[in-house]
Structures are given as C-alpha cells and as structure tokens.
C-alpha cells in the first residue's frame, strides 16, 4: 500500500472512496451474495471445468513455489458458469486476499488507483464485467499490470502535476461474458486466458446433490438429474431451480425431492424439459410466426418481444446456439430444424 505517501493521502481523501467501489460491486448482484454459502472454496471441491482446473492447478503451484504473484487471469463465458467462484478459489489456493469490484463501478482513474492502493503484495483484484471499464481507465491499467505502477494527474488546472504511484506485485482477475469487447492491448496483458464451458447434465447433477445437502433437503438421484436437464448447463440456474423445487416439495409434504415433484414444480414455473423458459419460447415463436424462422436481426427480435438486444445476446442466445436451436448467419438469426421440432412446428427447408 502507499499510505505513507502524503500526496496520495491528500488526493485519495478528496477524490474517491474505495468502500463504495466494493459495496457497489456486491450490491449489483443479490443472487451472488445469497450463493456464497454454496460456493466451493478450493479446486478439489469445484465440480466440472476439468481442463481449466488442471491448468490453474499448475499455474498456482508454480507461482507458490517461486513465491511470486500469479500471472493475470482472464475468465470468460456465459453468466452463471462460475467465474466469480473461480476467482475466490484462486485467492484461497494462493492464500492471499481478494478485492472484488465490477467494471461499471470504476468510473474515473482515481477509482482504480484507490482499489490498487488497497492491495498487499500477491493480493488479487477481481473485476467482474471488465469489458465495461472506460477506455481511459483501461489505459491506466496497462502499466499497473505490466510494471506495477500508475501515473496519475493530481490537482486541477495550472497546478495539476503527474504523480508516480508504485504498486506491489498483484494479480488482476478479469471476468467477462463478452470477451470480444475487450481491446487487444488489454487482452494481451493477461498471461492466463480461459473460457468456461457449459456443464454436462452429470456435472450439474453432482452440483445439485451437493447444494441439496447444504440445504439439508433430501433429494433422489433422478430428481437431481431432472433438475440438471432443465438448468441450461449452468450451475447458478441449477441451484435456483433447486430452491424453487424444494418449496414445492415442502408444501406437498414430500420426504425427498423426486423426479415427479421436480417435473410438477418446473412445469408450473414454465421451464421445459430442455431448460427453455418463456423468453426463449417467445423469441423462437416470434421468429417462426412473423419471420418464417429467419434470418432476422437481433434488434428486430428484441423490439418484437420487448427485451433489450444486449440482454438477449448475453443471457438468452448463447444457450440456444449451444443446443442447436438457433444459428447466426451473416444475414441474421435463424431457427434451426431442431428448434422447430422442439416447439412442435413443421420445418420447411429454406432454398
């Protein structure tokens, strides 16, 4: 930390407040906070992402043997796959502290410097939604990541002057659902870049059983598997569906969560046997009914169903692409034959 630097202390007190950066990041995701008790603490407890775990284990072990900070890490993939959890696990495995914030919370250079000032040697700064950091902030990060220092202007007008702030060796972990929005200079400064993949039903079944045990909610194997099939390959969704099914089981007086109560509960929640919800159905049905299955632009689809195009691109479209119900083409999105079949429509091959 640079607390012994009087120039920093004066600027720091006047320009920013680090607590609000950390609070804002936490307050932005109530669901993540509620899931803290469900998160594994170490790699050996983490289910799925086997190749990624093996790589991280090597990098972490090597950094600890050299007594160095871990290289900067970029994690990308759809929401809910465990990027934040992995950041916490890396901190635990390295036995260092972690500061957590989000890209939108870092609004000015002083915000970033304030966060970096909180770090001790080897600590981790985790930035969720790192693709949303402003360009001028991103440029300051270059020297911080490469050479562990930042230069920032202190004061205003004619009295403004550059001040050099040395930083301790640290690890930046960035998480994003949209890696294509990161600039090449920023992306190139991450030494470890990994994508998280959708989970298999078998992996999700293990996660559901583990979560049910934490909830002290008895669950049968076929019940856990049925939840996994409807969870869109995503642990966060699996845990959320389990919570709701647990409510149905309790009200119905069930001793354990079985496949029957899972089916009843999730049918009432309008989550079908492939994990598609109302928004998915509305998107596909609109494309079929009004645009003959496409091709049609994402903005047009969003306007038709009353959703933001950014929401559809980040939250809805990836899974439909993954399971083969939707295709991207140069002319727009197209519903596939599998998508037609799932919705019970006759497919007419386009010439």
UniProtKB/Swiss-Prot annotation:
Q: What are the start and end residues of every segment in region (Large ATPase domain (RuvB-L))?
A: 4-199
What InterPro entries does this protein map onto?
AAA+_ATPase, AAA_lid_4, DNA_helicase_Holl-junc_RuvB, P-loop_NTPase, RuvB-like_N, RuvB_C, WH-like_DNA-bd_sf, WH_DNA-bd_sf
- Can you cite a GO biological process for this protein? DNA recombination
Q: Where is this region: Small ATPAse domain (RuvB-S)?
A: 200-270
Q: Which UniProt keywords apply?
A: ATP-binding, Cytoplasm, DNA damage, DNA recombination, DNA repair, DNA-binding, Hydrolase, Nucleotide-binding
Q: Which domain of life is it from?
A: Bacteria
Q: Where does Mg(2+) bind?
A: 84
One GO molecular-function annotation for this sequence? Answer: ATP hydrolysis activity
- EC no. given is 3.6.4.-
Sequence positions that bind DNA: 328, 333
- UniProt entry tagged with the keyword DNA-binding: yes
Per UniProt, subcellular location reads as: Cytoplasm
Question: Would the keyword Hydrolase be found if you checked this record's keyword annotation?
Answer: yes
Q: Which family does it belong to?
A: Belongs to the RuvB family.
The domain-related comment in the record is: Has 3 domains, the large (RuvB-L) and small ATPase (RuvB-S) domains and the C-terminal head (RuvB-H) domain. The head domain binds DNA, while the ATPase domains jointly bind ATP, ADP or are empty depending on the state of the subunit in the translocation cycle. During a single DNA translocation step the structure of each domain remains the same, but their relative positions change.
Q: What quaternary arrangement does the UniProt entry report?
A: Homohexamer. Forms an RuvA(8)-RuvB(12)-Holliday junction (HJ) complex. HJ DNA is sandwiched between 2 RuvA tetramers; dsDNA enters through RuvA and exits via RuvB. An RuvB hexamer assembles on each DNA strand where it exits the tetramer. Each RuvB hexamer is contacted by two RuvA subunits (via domain III) on 2 adjacent RuvB subunits; this complex drives branch migration. In the full resolvosome a probable DNA-RuvA(4)-RuvB(12)-RuvC(2) complex forms which resolves the HJ.
What functional role does this protein have? The RuvA-RuvB-RuvC complex processes Holliday junction (HJ) DNA during genetic recombination and DNA repair, while the RuvA-RuvB complex plays an important role in the rescue of blocked DNA replication forks via replication fork reversal (RFR). RuvA specifically binds to HJ cruciform DNA, conferring on it an open structure. The RuvB hexamer acts as an ATP-dependent pump, pulling dsDNA into and through the RuvAB complex. RuvB forms 2 homohexamers on either side of HJ DNA bound by 1 or 2 RuvA tetramers; 4 subunits per hexamer contact DNA at a time.
Q: Report what the protein is called.
A: Holliday junction branch migration complex subunit RuvB
Q: Which organism is it from?
A: Leuconostoc mesenteroides subsp. mesenteroides (strain ATCC 8293 / DSM 20343 / BCRC 11652 / CCM 1803 / JCM 6124 / NCDO 523 / NBRC 100496 / NCIMB 8023 / NCTC 12954 / NRRL B-1118 / 37Y)
Q: Which gene encodes it?
A: ruvB
